[in-house]
């Protein structure tokens, strides 16, 4: 409680004034002047502020690294202009994606109908459900790009890539929807497949895992980059392999060719996620990354060996589990960490996917096609008469 000090009564006796040593002294604005009530309140509030605020200062200094500590996420007033290029490796990834552009209209599905009719019921069941997962998952990837990554990342080169990735994911989703629309004639079954996130528990489980990362406000950008590298690198891997298995059997040329194009694009998107991870100053720990990757592996293994077993199309479930682990190890290495499972690739036909194809360009467009001149340097496009032959 604040105490009020009563001011000294004025001295009126002339004799006292003569004897007083305080005669002629002014006490106004001196240190020993009793403070007024308003001044006392100010002093009390300042003291209280010091008492309650000072202990919190060390906590502020020791806080976790924020956006300002990450060059990728820091406010960038020059983000509206592309040149001059600052991150050349990220820009090259964008140009590589741009050179790989394709559209759904370029895929010939005319031979697929006859093949589809000749497939066993369990093979048709498997393919249709894999396509349903793919059609929904590309939309989820785009949701993350639009809602989170494109808004968080401030460097122009990465924003260019994310913008182009959004366009390509739309084309992938269109392609998968077109495949379902072409193969499935029953309207009710078609509707069931288009709403796979709601109608198919095995697809919903994978979708929920990805959607949870989009909505997680506590997870760092680095953790979410790893999670979506797992979505595009692990969640898609087994399904891609199962469709390439059909190619090995000479089935469904339109489906398998679109699978080549899409798997190449998703591989590039996964590589880009790893590149962004490498540019981070404050990365998640290896233990945290392993936890995210292993979680994704378990969900994908369950999806393709229990919920939608690959044995339906004649593949070995045990080998599929091993292949998913092999893909996860490759992703861990690309992120800069050590392998988790240390297994070999059990599918020899998947080794050829990374090699340059020898397809006759005049028979059909090759899966490793790139647009003319996009990846070449200015000097490569110049005309000269003194070139060496």
Swiss-Prot record:
<feature type="binding site">
    <location>
        <position position="232"/>
    </location>
    <ligand>
        <name>Fe cation 2</name>
    </ligand>
</feature>
<feature type="active site">
    <location>
        <position position="176"/>
    </location>
</feature>
<dbReference type="Pfam" id="PF00268">
    <property type="entry name" value="Ribonuc_red_sm"/>
</dbReference>
<dbReference type="GO" id="GO:1900087">
    <property type="term" value="P:positive regulation of G1/S transition of mitotic cell cycle"/>
</dbReference>
<keyword id="KW-0539">Nucleus</keyword>
<comment type="subunit">
    <text>Heterodimer of a large and a small subunit. Interacts (via Cy motif and when phosphorylated at Thr-33) with CCNF; the interaction occurs exclusively in G2 and early M.</text>
</comment>
<feature type="binding site">
    <location>
        <position position="169"/>
    </location>
    <ligand>
        <name>Fe cation 1</name>
    </ligand>
</feature>
<feature type="binding site">
    <location>
        <position position="266"/>
    </location>
    <ligand>
        <name>Fe cation 2</name>
    </ligand>
</feature>
<comment type="similarity">
    <text>Belongs to the ribonucleoside diphosphate reductase small chain family.</text>
</comment>
<feature type="modified residue" description="Phosphothreonine">
    <location>
        <position position="33"/>
    </location>
</feature>
<dbReference type="GO" id="GO:0005654">
    <property type="term" value="C:nucleoplasm"/>
</dbReference>
<dbReference type="GO" id="GO:0042803">
    <property type="term" value="F:protein homodimerization activity"/>
</dbReference>
<feature type="modified residue" description="Phosphoserine">
    <location>
        <position position="20"/>
    </location>
</feature>
<feature type="binding site">
    <location>
        <position position="169"/>
    </location>
    <ligand>
        <name>Fe cation 2</name>
    </ligand>
</feature>
<dbReference type="GO" id="GO:0005829">
    <property type="term" value="C:cytosol"/>
</dbReference>
<dbReference type="GO" id="GO:0005971">
    <property type="term" value="C:ribonucleoside-diphosphate reductase complex"/>
</dbReference>
<feature type="short sequence motif" description="Cy">
    <location>
        <begin position="49"/>
        <end position="51"/>
    </location>
</feature>
<feature type="binding site">
    <location>
        <position position="138"/>
    </location>
    <ligand>
        <name>Fe cation 1</name>
    </ligand>
</feature>
<dbReference type="GO" id="GO:0009263">
    <property type="term" value="P:deoxyribonucleotide biosynthetic process"/>
</dbReference>
<keyword id="KW-0963">Cytoplasm</keyword>
<feature type="binding site">
    <location>
        <position position="269"/>
    </location>
    <ligand>
        <name>Fe cation 2</name>
    </ligand>
</feature>
<keyword id="KW-0560">Oxidoreductase</keyword>
<comment type="function">
    <text>Provides the precursors necessary for DNA synthesis. Catalyzes the biosynthesis of deoxyribonucleotides from the corresponding ribonucleotides. Inhibits Wnt signaling.</text>
</comment>
<dbReference type="InterPro" id="IPR009078">
    <property type="entry name" value="Ferritin-like_SF"/>
</dbReference>
<dbReference type="GO" id="GO:0009185">
    <property type="term" value="P:ribonucleoside diphosphate metabolic process"/>
</dbReference>
<keyword id="KW-0215">Deoxyribonucleotide synthesis</keyword>
<dbReference type="GO" id="GO:0001824">
    <property type="term" value="P:blastocyst development"/>
</dbReference>
<dbReference type="InterPro" id="IPR033909">
    <property type="entry name" value="RNR_small"/>
</dbReference>
<dbReference type="GO" id="GO:0051290">
    <property type="term" value="P:protein heterotetramerization"/>
</dbReference>
<feature type="binding site">
    <location>
        <position position="172"/>
    </location>
    <ligand>
        <name>Fe cation 1</name>
    </ligand>
</feature>
<dbReference type="InterPro" id="IPR030475">
    <property type="entry name" value="RNR_small_AS"/>
</dbReference>
<dbReference type="GO" id="GO:0008199">
    <property type="term" value="F:ferric iron binding"/>
</dbReference>
<dbReference type="GO" id="GO:0004748">
    <property type="term" value="F:ribonucleoside-diphosphate reductase activity, thioredoxin disulfide as acceptor"/>
</dbReference>
<keyword id="KW-0597">Phosphoprotein</keyword>
<keyword id="KW-0479">Metal-binding</keyword>
<keyword id="KW-0408">Iron</keyword>
<keyword id="KW-0832">Ubl conjugation</keyword>
<dbReference type="GO" id="GO:0009265">
    <property type="term" value="P:2'-deoxyribonucleotide biosynthetic process"/>
</dbReference>
<dbReference type="InterPro" id="IPR012348">
    <property type="entry name" value="RNR-like"/>
</dbReference>
<protein>
    <recommendedName>
        <fullName>Ribonucleoside-diphosphate reductase subunit M2</fullName>
        <ecNumber>1.17.4.1</ecNumber>
    </recommendedName>
</protein>
<dbReference type="InterPro" id="IPR000358">
    <property type="entry name" value="RNR_small_fam"/>
</dbReference>
